[in-house]
Amino acid sequence: MKIRILVLILCALTQGCTYVDDYMLGKDNTPQPKELKEIQPKVKMAQSWTTPVGKAHKTNEYLNIKPAIRGDVIYTADASGLVQAVNRKDGQIKWSTALKNNIVSGPTVAAGYVAVGTNASTLVLLNQSDGKEIWQNKVSAEVLAPPAISHQKVIAKTIDGKVYAIDAVNGKQLWVADHGAPSLVLKASSSPIIVDDLVLVGFSDGKLDALELQTGRLIWQRSIAYGTGASDVERLVDIDSDPIISNNVAYLATYQGYVGALSLSNGQFIWRKPASVYKNMLLSHNNLYFTDSNDVLWSLNSSTGQVNWKQTSLKARGLTAPALVGGNLAVGDKTGYLHILSTQTGELLGRSQLSGGVTVSPSVSGKNMYVLTNNGMLNQLSVS
């Protein structure tokens, strides 16, 4: 079955925001970013260093290429095919590997490996210490979300609804599970999550599968949202936000569907609310934070789903998923601004502008942020 891929920018298509991939051409009705109002800064951001880790690329803003922090090193991937290890203290490059194909997801860094997906429908595994290629493995379609690595296995989900388990040592495919996919999907995707001996995978039809890690056998399946409407676009209910697992509860979100908490003990929803989300959520201190498809930031009580606050002053600015830095929230926007918000109230506490658009959520260690911009620069900023 041919899969059509939809590129979503800034807002729900049902509200007229229509920038799509090459199967659909037409006028771009993307709304103008909401004008920023003057604020009295309550936090300060200072930039320590910046270093090039790739090239400016028109597809950078659509890719799931968030830098990964491990110890004193931050690992980056760029659409041009460049994977690098960068010293967090001074921005110096430790190693650099140029792949033959463009990168569409990653890096995932674990167990001494670095994994990325390419536009040639290949998974590539590198050695974490020196960047040397260990293997490449051809799969059925693009891997648009960073794979998972655990128990010497690399687990990856392809855009056509397959899940692959690959031996990390030799690159051999261990099993493939075929869930399938609708005819139209968003150009976004959630990563597999490994929980004990299960792999939890969200799919483009709004279903969550639990697969046995060793065999790929389907253990159970839950429908998180159901597609409704007359058109393929109206029926989009992709699970593109990574499931968050805490205390035997899965926090889930879908596009044009719901955000909710699902008990892994009995498969029942603890709570569920209508929402449209396709970026990763953040769970911290009994609060669930997320950016919805209209660029409204929300805070919900993770136990009850009750709304703590919402921040609407950044609508249509192309916000990233939120990150936690120094006890506050940080989001980037497509015009290059970083915004700091209070976790308690959603109040805007500060902002800083970088040299390129910020469409990948900041990577954080303590009070330091590492921000990848669409012009291929990695920026280190401290928040105080």
From Swiss-Prot:
It comes from the Bacteria. SMART domains: PQQ. It is found in: Cell outer membrane. Keywords: Cell outer membrane, Lipoprotein, Membrane, Palmitate, Signal. SUPFAM superfamilies: Quinoprotein alcohol dehydrogenase-like (SSF50998). A lipid is attached at C17 (N-palmitoyl cysteine). Part of the Bam complex. This is Outer membrane protein assembly factor BamB. It comes from Legionella pneumophila (strain Paris).
